[in-house]
Swiss-Prot record:
Species the sequence originates in: Streptomyces griseus subsp. griseus (strain JCM 4626 / CBS 651.72 / NBRC 13350 / KCC S-0626 / ISP 5235)
Assembly behavior: Part of the 50S ribosomal subunit.
Classification of source organism: Bacteria, Bacillati, Actinomycetota, Actinomycetes, Kitasatosporales
Protein name per its UniProtKB record: Large ribosomal subunit protein uL16
Gene: rplP
Single GO MF annotation: rRNA binding
Any single Gene Ontology cellular-component annotation: cytosolic large ribosomal subunit
Amino acid sequence: MLIPRRVKHRKQHHPKRSGMSKGGTQVAFGEYGIQALTPAYVTNRQIESARIAMTRHIKRGGKVWINIYPDRPLTKKPAETRMGSGKGSPEWWIANVKPGRVMFELSYPNEKIAREALTRAAHKLPMKCRIVRREAGES
């Protein structure tokens, strides 16, 4: 699973989910990609689950790129704890995904199998997604 090796601060503020993605909105490496349509926090477990769903469907002959990284900690207080007495301990690592961001890319010779693999991966993610294809003019 994806987690940072070292962090400067163990606990951070929650990232803002408003606005559109500033970069990473086009397919850059593969032929097809999964693009976010709504904002969400994507955990490292969800990223890994989507990656496994894709790679198991395409078996061999394809390549997968993951364009998001869970570098923000989310904290949680224990159950049945009264309010106050500090912030909770880090529970998850999340990637803050904004609309328009291409999260996963896939290169595979058969378009039908590639689209099915990306659809399976999109079902594992906590937001609305669409499958995008590299434009003819893009390098």
